[in-house]
Amino acid sequence: GTAQGYHAMTFGFLLGEIIRRVDGRSVGTFFKEEIADVFDVDFKIGLQESDFERCADLIMQEAPINVINFFRRIPRWLLPSRIRMIGDTLSSTEYRKAFIEILRTEDQKVQNVTAFPNTPQWRKAEIPAANGHGTARGVAKFFSILSNGGSRDGKSLLKQETIDLATTEFSTGPDKVLFQGPYKFGLGYMLDAPLSP
């Protein structure tokens, strides 16, 4: 390819569909039965209503409108290049497809992005790369397995060579969705880069 554009929704659904077609189970069921239950990891992809009481609401800070309006009043050529890149990204087709259009309802209204992740629909959905829910201990346990060669307590999750392949740089450069930042990606992981150490 000639460019990169972060898109968690597409990436997760593509891999989830491969799992479903090869194995027959949804990605949430597969993760639960093959990883979470086996390694006692408190993490789920797609919640049951009974899990909601354990789930904290996300509270996102919206950009202060006075800051946005301040930058809109300044001629573009006077803005620092980083601010110009952010503005260009927010108005780009790629950004809108990745983060705005997905929130449209059937009547074409854009849902409140700050409230959407707290809805029952979002929490129940199995969105492989975007809405896993887990405890801090569960996330730490999962990544401790990966950081220790893919095994724990005599059970193997991944081979070391698979982990090495997943964390090998496959894509780098200005990202068309993430504000033209110099991000690096492996196979499923954002890698160490100036803006994402």
What is each stretch, according to the model?
Residues 1-196:
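Short, surface-exposed loop or secondary-structure junction motifs
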